[in-house]
Amino acid sequence: MDNDGGAPPPPPTLVVEEPKKAEIRGVAFKELFRFADGLDYVLMGIGSVGAFVHGCSLPLFLRFFADLVNSFGSNSNNVEKMMEEVLKYALYFLVVGAAIWASSWAEISCWMWSGERQTTKMRIKYLEAALNQDIQFFDTEVRTSDVVFAINTDAVMVQDAISEKLGNFIHYMATFVSGFIVGFTAVWQLALVTLAVVPLIAVIGGIHTTTLSKLSNKSQESLSQAGNIVEQTVVQIRVVMAFVGESRASQAYSSALKIAQKLGYKTGLAKGMGLGATYFVVFCCYALLLWYGGYLVRHHLTNGGLAIATMFAVMIGGLALGQSAPSMAAFAKAKVAAAKIFRIIDHKPTIERNSESGVELDSVTGLVELKNVDFSYPSRPDVKILNNFCLSVPAGKTIALVGSSGSGKSTVVSLIERFYDPNSGQVLLDGQDLKTLKLRWLRQQIGLVSQEPALFATSIKENILLGRPDADQVEIEEAARVANAHSFIIKLPDGFDTQVGERGLQLSGGQKQRIAIARAMLKNPAILLLDEATSALDSESEKLVQEALDRFMIGRTTLIIAHRLSTIRKADLVAVLQQGSVSEIGTHDELFSKGENGVYAKLIKMQEAAHETAMSNARKSSARPSSARNSVSSPIMTRNSSYGRSPYSRRLSDFSTSDFSLSIDASSYPNYRNEKLAFKDQANSFWRLAKMNSPEWKYALLGSVGSVICGSLSAFFAYVLSAVLSVYYNPDHEYMIKQIDKYCYLLIGLSSAALVFNTLQHSFWDIVGENLTKRVREKMLSAVLKNEMAWFDQEENESARIAARLALDANNVRSAIGDRISVIVQNTALMLVACTAGFVLQWRLALVLVAVFPVVVAATVLQKMFMTGFSGDLEAAHAKGTQLAGEAIANVRTVAAFNSEAKIVRLYTANLEPPLKRCFWKGQIAGSGYGVAQFCLYASYALGLWYASWLVKHGISDFSKTIRVFMVLMVSANGAAETLTLAPDFIKGGQAMRSVFELLDRKTEIEPDDPDTTPVPDRLRGEVELKHIDFSYPSRPDIQIFRDLSLRARAGKTLALVGPSGCGKSSVISLIQRFYEPSSGRVMIDGKDIRKYNLKAIRKHIAIVPQEPCLFGTTIYENIAYGHECATEAEIIQAATLASAHKFISALPEGYKTYVGERGVQLSGGQKQRIAIARALVRKAEIMLLDEATSALDAESERSVQEALDQACSGRTSIVVAHRLSTIRNAHVIAVIDDGKVAEQGSHSHLLKNHPDGIYARMIQLQRFTHTQVIGMTSGSSSRVKEDDA
């Protein structure tokens, strides 16, 4: 076969590839509210009224203000009447303030709660719809990280748009409209002129929004990609650490962030130019209005008060249109985010899970038939898996499927479960096509135990209950007893309530598999599908479970995928699959009797040859007859047992606090979310972030210049308008014309400055913000990857949460620090300019107005305090739901097989209830706090105007000065209020800063790259020794794994570890890789304590082949190259050839460039394992750690790969965890681990000779017994099988 199975790409970085996606178009705006119910419409109605009244209040206030100006102007000779009028209008101001108090409460509380209610329903519907999709949808369309991203980030975007931003939009549009109404009723000519320029503002706003929407869409895609890299890295953290891939993960993450960063720069420029253009048009419009207003006053068509009312109203209305732009940008983002969510919700699966159509059979006899089935996986339609496939499983009988890895055995199981429909042909149950049967009913009749025991991060009891949710405790315990799980469960501190951790990692593979079997038994199905059901069990457990399965199978139609003879010895029929069709079918005896002409017989001969070799070695030193394999029996054809046991999984060592109970205990959330951030800490964190941002000081300086000038423009603008007001009352028309012309030119100058400096402000502050975000995210990932393994074992550091934390914390920090500082600088400049002008013109009035500012500040700070308490743990509560959703999608086949969709959705719904309740109270308090602050503001206006009239009455000041001071300071007070309404962002930013620095400051228990350690020589001898090791996993110190364990692997020799499931074999491998530190004792390499070496450097001399082949979602080439980043193409092909992988890779349409899918789902288990072996071989390390390295391979591959491994391990120190004797027959030393220490140690022959009644001998006896039974079945058919081969 041609050697180039697709030209491989250049050397690897961990870039996660994915199928190209079409650009997503946003949904219609009204579609955002598709989950609103009656109460939501009521809330939105009240919220809209509140927002409308709130928005109208300012133009109404301006109308009163204009009337007051006229009172000043027309009553200058009658001070008593003037005081009376002013007092009346001051009371009107208080009424407006009270209206704002009530309306802002209604606006904020109703929109906030309605938004949370609607998005809660949307999240639930999304998960429901995602779980309702057929399996092919997850193969081709959606990754787990997409679901996590949608539920986390996209849903938050939609919520932001349909709550706060929509309230703001109605508020600003009400201001805009009411401003024009006030204008038209005051001076319609002036208002009409203004109306002529509004379309121009709208066009600019439209272009601005469209541009931001496109950029936002692209940015979200690149951030989603970055999040996927983080999630894959953390999920496979053991592989990343073992192969020293931390820097590669960081580089890949950095590359993905760079794309988002550049898009962020463009967004800043677009935002600045859009806002600048809006202000340019608005200011030019007012220049025109001032000139035209003067014309109308001179011609006695209006007076100064009405003219100024129109201008003020139009000014506020026009600015409100600009202020609505961020809301429009949020709508654009939300429409795109909603499109992604609704695409899943609206997607009709090809195979409808919840359809009520289809029949339910009265009784099931269990005849299963596949007739002329052709099938290709939707993700690879050009690769045919089944070709004119025919198979009949008689009712109540057991059929075993054997065949090479990738021959289609698991595909048959998938078709019977109706995860897929065949391309052509039929799958029948009792003569009925599966397509005509009700799907939920069909799956209720089928019990599935797959080779990958998928457990959820809940209790053992809840995991078993997935089989039948209405079962009682007695039935649960009985199922566990029959599955040989009861004995180990009751020894656990929490028994059946023990938490199994994310993906069941708290349990050994064998323990997980027994729980999966108990789950299937509880279902009591008519048809049983066993896909390598006992592959992850040690000899003793396998024998007990197999006996339980044998009892369980009686009277049920059973289809077994297996590679061990013991597993299939009692099958009524054996079907041999080859190249997508059944090449042989018959009983074991019939197939074996074909001899040389039969595929099955050849396979058994191959196995027997392996036994012969093992036995001849054993017989040289021991006359004692023994079974020749360390597993219960010999494999016939290896199938994917790849997920049978996590090679690195902790052995019942720490139990996650994750909890599927319906109540959420706030105390279980990370403390940093609940604690209030002390001001000192916050200030300290702020300065640290500022230092982190120091390379951008030039950009920050230029951005600040933009902010200062943009802020000052507002004060100048107010001054120009108040100056014109006094000019309007001047009787000298020539003077009026000259002054108005001067101020109009000044306004045109201000409009040009607004265009330039808005662009400057937003462009440069966005560069500062984007660089900070990228830097914070990179540092956070580096800090995450420096932590020791025990940190990753904690529930709050689960992969989806870390990905979300990197995304949200960095964003919140950027929001608070980058975006908001720009606004603060702008408003500070505004206040300074305004206060200076006020004090210069009339210091007494300025002093009174400035004196009431603290009241406003106090009111807003009160709101800030309440916001802290109520926003604290919302993110954590959502994180729990997000984790559950991610697990459900990752294990979607298990969820589907057990009809558990409704249960998962119920648990998810329960997780969303607490944040919903808290959001209600948060809205009440935030709304009231904001209302109080606004009321105080208007009360201060009333006080200021009353005092101004008092000053005029007593001759201390005149009308012209007081009105200028009042207007300039009124504008600055609005700026102060706007600054303080940013409090929620600073609270989020403060919490995020705490979270960021908590992560960055954490001192790892095991430093991976300590410069003070001893350098590792270029070549090691490779001697490994564990001396007097005591060990417990850090999270459960009360469960001791090892007690005074001592082991030694001599340089260049092979040490095999055997023992019952859960005895700590894989813990030895974890200690050698220094994932954990022993409680006492030492792990030595070449006679030196491993702690003295640089950890990353020593790991470069160790290669691992885990039983669970963890692959990254990239190409085959890059997965192999992950073993050695400098490997050449020739070395990669050589490693693949040695691992028996080159042939199947070359046969794929894209060869080495084939995308393997998330966690390698596009490949069979055997194929994944061979790639994992190639990855280890390309490393050329002195120490090889093989954890069931060949367990997932078929007989032919196993033999060639075992030879390759023997050859590769030659001269290298090898530590092998194995169940099969063929894997360890040549081991120099076999160590039997039991009860936390080495119970027996020596070569195979030594153990049998010196410990005839020992544990190892008993295991051999057990295998001998089962194997003899199998051989007994074949002896009638073939004289070539020797008796002593058993």
Curated annotation (Swiss-Prot):
Residues binding brassinolide, per UniProt: Y286, Y941, E978
Tissue specificity remark: Ubiquitous, with high levels in peduncles. Mostly localized in young developing tissues, including meristems, as well as root and shoot apices.
Binding site for ATP 1: D139, Y377, S379, R380, G408, K409, S410, T411
Disulfide bonds: none
Residues annotated as domain ABC transporter: 368-604, 1024-1260
Disrupted-gene phenotype: Reduced brassinosteroid export. Lower petiole angles under red plus far-red light. The abcb1 abcb19 double mutant is severely dwarfed, with excessive leaf and petiole curling, reduced internode lengths, increased stem and silique waving and skewing, and exhibits poor flower fertility due to short stamen filaments not sufficiently elongated to position the anthers above the stigma during anthesis; this phenotype is associated with lower free auxin levels in blue light and reduced length of epidermal cells in the middle of stamen.
Domain ABC transmembrane type-1 residues, every copy: 44-333, 700-988
GO biological-process terms attached to the record: anthocyanin accumulation in tissues in response to UV light; auxin export across the plasma membrane; auxin polar transport; auxin-activated signaling pathway; photomorphogenesis; positive gravitropism; positive regulation of brassinosteroid mediated signaling pathway; regulation of cell size
Matches recorded under PROSITE patterns: ABC_TM1F (PS50929), ABC_TRANSPORTER_1 (PS00211), ABC_TRANSPORTER_2 (PS50893)
Binding site for ATP 2: D793, Y1033, R1036, G1064, K1065, S1066
Reaction equation(s) it catalyzes: (indol-3-yl)acetate(in) + ATP + H2O = (indol-3-yl)acetate(out) + ADP + phosphate + H(+); brassinolide(in) + ATP + H2O = brassinolide(out) + ADP + phosphate + H(+); 24-epi-brassinolide(in) + ATP + H2O = 24-epi-brassinolide(out) + ADP + phosphate + H(+); 24-epi-castasterone(in) + ATP + H2O = 24-epi-castasterone(out) + ADP + phosphate + H(+)
Transmembrane regions listed in the UniProt entry: 42-62, 93-113, 166-186, 187-207, 277-297, 301-321, 705-725, 745-765, 821-843, 845-867, 932-952, 967-987
Keywords associated with the record: ATP-binding, Auxin signaling pathway, Brassinosteroid signaling pathway, Cell membrane, Glycoprotein, Membrane, Nucleotide-binding, Repeat, Transmembrane, Transmembrane helix, Transport
Region (Interaction with FKBP42/TWD1): 1049-1286
Effect of F61A: Reduced brassinolide-triggered ATPase activity and altered brassinosteroid exporter activity
Cellular component GO terms held in the UniProt record: endoplasmic reticulum; plasma membrane; plasmodesma
Region (Disordered): 614-647
Glycosylation sites: N217, N640, N771, N797
Gene Ontology terms for molecular function: ABC-type transporter activity; ATP binding; ATP hydrolysis activity; ATPase-coupled transmembrane transporter activity; auxin efflux transmembrane transporter activity; auxin influx transmembrane transporter activity
InterPro entries: AAA+_ATPase (IPR003593), ABC1_TM_dom (IPR011527), ABC1_TM_sf (IPR036640), ABC_transporter-like_ATP-bd (IPR003439), ABC_transporter-like_CS (IPR017871), P-loop_NTPase (IPR027417), Type_1_exporter (IPR039421)
Protein name: ABC transporter B family member 1
